[in-house]
């Protein structure tokens, strides 16, 4: 991990010229990373760290700050926006912003996940989406132990625990726990 050991070699110079690098001094690539043609790595908003053995399929767009864990895969056409952390051995596609994916979780297909926490070993079926903003722009309230709690946040998506699954076309409401 580059945050723990800054003396590791950055393999960014081995990236194919068909990959678009924006603010490349803020892009850090580990060993044996594959980045296919047409990928955009935009670190103008913060660093992008891609750990060892990750695989980025063609035409994915990744904006920093972002961390992609060891042996994870970012699928073709994915849009990974700012403030995303993806653990090791994950498969992520579709649109993702301001979210955390813990290790071994999958969201391979189309759909939106935003302002969310995805536990370990979670599988989100094709076209799973979450809302992260109420239509009236009010603060989000969630239910915990049969009690309504005001989060104080205008944006809050899905919080899904370890080993959870969703089927295809699942829609999660704003602030779903």
Where are these regions (language model features)?
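Terminal amphipathic alpha-helical/low-complexity segments used for targeting or macromolecular assembly
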Residues: 1-26, 32
